[in-house]
């Protein structure tokens, strides 16, 4: 029988003294290593857009073998890996299309979600094509959405995960700040626009972290690993405007392996 997330913690605390008393006899039989049942949900930051090496069977979802979920699964022998994250996914897409493999046997779930609900692509398009005033107005609209509408949408997703897999460890990962302010970029967006974009990233991370914590989920802050590797840093782990255009403002292969993967490793 699998225990609930809270019950498992309590049982571990109760079991520790018993193991101390009977450790010698318990050590006679080495425990069998159990395979981890891992489901990776979310949007393009989880599917690995921008990292290359896409699984052709994933189509427009662009699931990459260089994404942090695929790298985590490959480095943990015996992992049963279900990869349903998809480029462009919103919270409603997770609910409608991605949760099938999440069940009472699931051990680990990871997810990035919310950026597309808040208008990530449209915001960055506006900022690059319409100038500072339009950019700042679009960012303000996105930040209002993040504060007023996104929390309830995240709750729906997190409630669904918790209901389907009450004993699973759930790791919710955030988004990196895009820009190093005062950095090396001589052209492109204004510094004011860059600062506003970073502030919006901080907003969505704060909202996501709060909703995750309220569900008993871990939150992984990737700004700890991306620091010094933002756009305009001289050593970015994010694509700037590039071709194919969908790679723009997404993690590179280094962003996945050195930015996201260490955060998931730390949480698990």
Curated annotation (Swiss-Prot):
pH effects: Optimum pH is 9.5.
Reactions this protein catalyses: a triacylglycerol + H2O = a diacylglycerol + a fatty acid + H(+); hexadecanoyl-CoA + H2O = hexadecanoate + CoA + H(+)
Principal localisation: secreted
Cysteines joined through disulfide linkages: 61-86, 127-135, 185-232
Family: Belongs to the 'GDSL' lipolytic enzyme family.
Matching SUPFAM superfamilies: SGNH hydrolase
Entry keywords, A to Z: Disulfide bond, Hydrolase, Lipid degradation, Lipid metabolism, Secreted, Serine esterase, Signal
UniProt-listed Enzyme Commission number(s): 3.1.1.3, 3.1.1.-, 3.1.2.2
Gene Ontology CC entries for this record: extracellular region
A Pfam family hit: Lipase_GDSL_2
Localization annotation: Secreted
Induction (UniProt): Expressed once the cells enter stationary phase, with a maximum at the late stationary phase.
Protein name: Lipase
Cleavable signal peptide: 1-34
GO molecular function: carboxylesterase activity; long-chain fatty acyl-CoA hydrolase activity; phospholipase activity; triacylglycerol lipase activity
Quaternary state and interactors: Monomer.
Source superkingdom: Bacteria
Organism: Streptomyces rimosus
Enzyme class, UniProt record, top EC level: hydrolase
Regulation: Inhibited by 3,4-dichloroisocoumarin and tetrahydrolipstatin in the absence of substrate, but by phenylmethylsulfonyl fluoride (PMSF) only in the presence of substrate. Several water-miscible solvents enhance the lipase hydrolytic activity in vitro. Tetrahydrofuran and N,N-dimethylformamide (both 50%) inactivate the enzyme with t1/2 of 5 minutes and t1/2 of 2 hours, respectively.
Matches recorded under InterPro entries: SEST-like (IPR037460), SGNH_hydro (IPR013830), SGNH_hydro_sf (IPR036514)
Statement: the UniProt record of this protein carries the keyword NAD: no
Thermal dependence of activity, per record: Optimum temperature is 55 degrees Celsius at pH 8.0.
A single GO BP: triglyceride catabolic process
């Amino acid at each position: 029988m699998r225990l609930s997330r809270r019950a498992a913690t309590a049982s571990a605390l109760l079991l520790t003294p018993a193991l101390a008393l009977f450790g010698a006899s318990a050590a006679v039989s080495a425990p069998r290593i159990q395979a981890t049942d891992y489901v990776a949900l979310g949007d393009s930051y989880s599917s690995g857009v921008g990292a290359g090496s896409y699984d052709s069977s994933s189509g427009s979802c662009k699931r990459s073998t260089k994404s942090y979920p695929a790298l985590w699964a490959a480095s943990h022998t015996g992992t049963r890996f279900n990869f349903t994250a998809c480029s462009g996914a919103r919270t409603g897409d997770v609910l409608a299309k991605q949760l099938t493999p999440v069940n009472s046997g699931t051990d680990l779930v990871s997810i990035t979600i919310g950026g597309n609900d808040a208008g990530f692509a449209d915001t960055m398009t506006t900022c690059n094509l319409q100038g500072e005033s339009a950019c700042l107005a679009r960012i303000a609209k996105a930040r209002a959405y993040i504060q007023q509408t996104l929390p309830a949408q995240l709750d729906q997703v997190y409630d669904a995960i918790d209901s389907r897999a009450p004993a699973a460890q759930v790791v919710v990962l955030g988004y990196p700040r895009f820009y190093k302010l005062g950095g090396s970029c001589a052209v492109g967006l204004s510094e004011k626009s860059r600062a506003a974009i970073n502030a919006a990233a901080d907003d969505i991370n704060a909202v996501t972290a709060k909703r995750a914590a309220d569900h008993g989920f871990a939150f992984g802050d990737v700004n700890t690993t991306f620091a010094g590797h933002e756009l305009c840093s001289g050593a970015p782990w994010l694509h700037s405007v590039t071709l194919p255009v969908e790679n723009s403002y997404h993690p590179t292969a280094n962003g996945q392996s050195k930015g996201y993967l260490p955060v998931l490793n730390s949480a698990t």
